């Protein structure tokens, strides 16, 4: 993947100003609510029976934060994202058996929550850079499935 200097700057800026404790839980909660079949991978998280329960679930919040911190690794290794996520790809495919399409669903939810947080600052250029970055991460996480 080729990154322009502008794309690198946008991605770095987004993640350097991101409120992980806010964005992470909101993005994962949105994914679990909008795409309820994704809940099957979180059966150990307790009550996921409705939107209110999911939004208030401490395990969901903690995992959402963990996911965003995992994306930090990609931001710091933009020239080698596939290798950065190779071990995580193996874990999700061979042990957890996560449908790789779920990574795309979560990345879409992250984009929506970031867009809502940034408001007018979430320009088309910002969206393009963020979605490109997340698509590369999603591809890397799905490598083990191929």
From Swiss-Prot:
CDD domains, A to Z: Hb-beta-like
Pfam families on file: Globin
Listed GO MF terms: haptoglobin binding; heme binding; metal ion binding; organic acid binding; oxygen binding; oxygen carrier activity; peroxidase activity
Keyword Metal-binding in annotation: yes
Keywords: Heme, Iron, Metal-binding, Oxygen transport, Transport
Family under the similarity heading: Belongs to the globin family.
Role, per record: Involved in oxygen transport from gills to the various peripheral tissues.
Subunit structure and binding partners: Hb 1 is a heterotetramer of two alpha-1 and two beta-1 chains.
Additional information: This fish has two hemoglobins: Hb1 (major) and Hb2 (about 15-20% of the total). They display the Root effect and the alkaline Bohr effect, which is enhanced by organophosphate and to a lesser extent by chloride.
Name of the molecule in the record: Hemoglobin subunit beta-1
Organism: Gobionotothen gibberifrons
Lineage: Eukaryota, Metazoa, Chordata, Craniata, Vertebrata
